[in-house]
Amino acid sequence: MANIRKTHPLLKIINGAVIDLPTPSNISAWWNFGSLLGLCLITQVLTGLFLAMHYTADITLAFSSVAHICRDVNYGWLLRNIHANGASFFFICIYLHIARGLYYGSYLYKETWNIGVLLLLLVMMTAFVGYVLPWGQMSFWGATVITNLLSAFPYIGDTLVQWIWGGFSVDNATLTRFFTFHFLLPFIIMGATMLHLLFLHETGSNNPTGLNSDADKVTFHPYFSYKDLLGFTILLAILSALALLNPNLLGDPENFTPANPLVTPPHIKPEWYFLFAYAILRSIPNKLGGVLALLLSILILVVVPVLHTSKQRSNTFRPPSQTLFWILVANMLVLTWIGGQPVEHPFIIIGQIASVLYFMLFLILIPLTGWLENKILDWA
């Protein structure tokens, strides 16, 4: 009699996805981040669900309800700290996951990659509306500044902003709808994640060499299930340490002050994981130009597969392309730093140079280097 996991209609899908899945034997720890993102998503949904049971989406009560969760609800402080810092870890894992894809040429699985870019946009949207919910100063002013950017679109801009606000300013209607979106989007993310996996399992995983690995595959379980378990342990250990020992390290002190429309904070800035995009937005003096640059800083990932010029898939055997990849990483760190600095000399010019370099790397330098490497191979 055949094993039930191979015959049962539901179990055989699970079996094909996480048990008997043929996996390249040489994938490294960089392939752990997909499952870590799954862990982050589950953690965020569970902590978020329990927080939503005690949260009140009303401007007179939102700030107090968060204080109530932290003071009066059993382990409410822990739920909140894990949820807030879990978002940071979510983005760390996403950025490392994307970096892995860029380095090893995983983006050539176009369907998987495009769903991944969509997932990134959904997660960013979810994090943005979630940051507004505690209704502190930075929540309120962050919502005001970022939604106001839509007014840069010609003709429809002002109407669009008022439509999103539900009035003439960020108010109760805005908070209520942001809570609705923050509750709904993670379930859409879960659906998109299943599509992401569906497309991935059509082709199988890439590997560090970028070569076809059909000749050397092993079952996902037990080899990579245990390897993933180690990643889970490390992630949860670091997340727990941060949530328990220094939960406000990555937050903004301004958000401990209840929202006040009459007092503007000295420096309005988003959470650290949006700072690179915020720096690109601020480095362009024109409002519409800034908004377009902000959008393109993420959407540029969609054109990466089209601009792949090299005969080799992975960067493993391409030192010039490796150099450009690490310049891109350093550039992202510079942009993140600039995004948190005030708009004054020398930060303005540094931000502008870093922004130009960011787009140049994707659109010109990396494709050109791939082409040059092909030429060098031909000469050799």
Curated annotation (Swiss-Prot):
The keyword Transmembrane helix applies. Gene3D superfamilies: Cytochrome Bc1 Complex, Chain C. It comes from the Eukaryota. The keyword Transmembrane applies. Its cofactor is heme b. GO terms for biological process: mitochondrial electron transport, ubiquinol to cytochrome c. InterPro entries: Cyt_b/b6_C (IPR005798), Cyt_b/b6_C_sf (IPR036150), Cyt_b/b6_N (IPR005797), Cytb/b6-like_sf (IPR027387), Cytochrome_b (IPR030689), Cytochrome_b_C_euk/bac (IPR048260), Cytochrome_b_N_euk/bac (IPR048259), Di-haem_cyt_TM (IPR016174). GO terms for molecular function: metal ion binding; ubiquinol-cytochrome-c reductase activity. Its main location: mitochondrion. Keywords: Electron transport, Heme, Iron, Membrane, Metal-binding, Mitochondrion, Mitochondrion inner membrane, Respiratory chain, Transmembrane, Transmembrane helix, Transport, Ubiquinone. Belongs to the cytochrome b family. Heme 1 (or BL or b562) is low-potential and absorbs at about 562 nm, and heme 2 (or BH or b566) is high-potential and absorbs at about 566 nm. This is Cytochrome b.
